[in-house]
């Protein structure tokens, strides 16, 4: 089967998300990276793309060049991934959708409701795929939790509590660090800082696992470091359309927490807990029964969890990267 042609905007050298997309897109031999505009510095972006194997005539200096260069090619890319700063997502996604490209965009897709509605309309009219990368929902044991909820194994959901909090931006001197500073600058990040960066993952996880949508909410945003225009901490209370009560905390100044993304779902007949720092395990407690640890790869999992378990039981999902380290 011929590989799909893939292009990337953003995710340049030194970024965290760029290598994750490049490894992920090409892990199963389904995609080949054939075009890219990888950096806001045109020459750096072109040079890095060529080092990654992109032909010189498809290593672009910016997204506008990439759109102009790809739209009329007979071998144009099949999918464009947008991994640029938040405030640029809407403009880039809209332009590529209107030109007839499929788009996978990093979160958040837009910073305004009307922009989101416009993207939905354009995607529907174009007939093209337009998706947002909520990557944590693809962990096997997250899929197991969702399947258990859907199957009624913990009864009607009463309460969901989720948080995504870390302390890696807790140093006020980070005001001078460009890799941190942009996240709290409205010109680059849009109208939200920490919530758009991490809290949105927690909100999506609540909707995804509970198989329900947020209907109403109230929120308290705070900038605990005075130099920051946008929030570095937020608390959100919400209600879902099915009646579930929700609680969410997200913070980048919670010193001592490393990658504190977890979710707890409490139903009428049981509870579930999953944490990204222990992604191979799902904690299940039936009402009146003993707490159980459900392991990735064990027998009896729901089909979606089995399908996405890429390595055998007791191995971390990062096992192939340990092998990759031997070659580097």
Give a label for each model feature:
Residues 1-54:
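N-terminal Rossmann-like dinucleotide-binding module
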């Amino acid at each position: 089967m011929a590989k799909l042609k893939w292009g990337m905007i953003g995710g340049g050298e030194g970024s965290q998300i760029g290598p994750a997309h490049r490894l992920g897109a090409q892990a199963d031999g389904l995609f080949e990276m054939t075009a890219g505009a990888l950096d806001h510095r045109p020459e750096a972006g072109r040079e890095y793309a060529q080092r990654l194997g992109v032909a010189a005539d498809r290593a672009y200096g910016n997204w506008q060049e990439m759109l102009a260069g790809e739209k009329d090619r007979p071998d144009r890319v099949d999918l464009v991934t947008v991994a640029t700063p938040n405030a640029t997502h809407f403009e880039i996604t809209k332009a590529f959708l209107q030109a007839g490209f499929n788009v996978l965009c990093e979160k958040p897709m837009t910073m305004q409701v009307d922009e989101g509605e416009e993207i939905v309309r354009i995607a529907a009219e174009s007939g093209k795929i337009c998706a947002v990368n909520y990557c944590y929902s693809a962990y096997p044991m997250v899929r197991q939790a969702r399947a258990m909820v859907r199957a009624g194994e913990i009864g009607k959901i009463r309460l969901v509590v989720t948080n995504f909090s870390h302390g890696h931006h807790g140093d006020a001197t980070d005001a001078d660090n460009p890799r941190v500073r942009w996240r709290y600058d409205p010109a680059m990040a849009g109208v939200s800082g920490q919530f758009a960066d991490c809290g949105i993952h927690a909100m999506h996880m609540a909707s995804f696992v509970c198989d329900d949508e947020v209907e109403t909410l109230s929120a308290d945003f705070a900038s605990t470091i005075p130099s920051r225009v946008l929030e570095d901490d937020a608390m959100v209370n919400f209600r879902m359309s099915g009646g579930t009560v929700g609680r969410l905390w997200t913070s980048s100044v919670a010193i001592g927490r490393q990658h504190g993304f977890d979710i707890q779902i409490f139903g009428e007949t049981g509870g579930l807990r999953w944490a990204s720092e222990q992604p191979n395990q799902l904690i299940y407690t039936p009402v009146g029964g003993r707490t159980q640890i459900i392991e990735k790869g064990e027998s009896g999992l729901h089909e979606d969890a089995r399908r996405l378990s890429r390595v055998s039981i007791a191995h971390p999902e990062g096992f192939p990267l340990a092998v990759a380290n031997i070659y580097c």
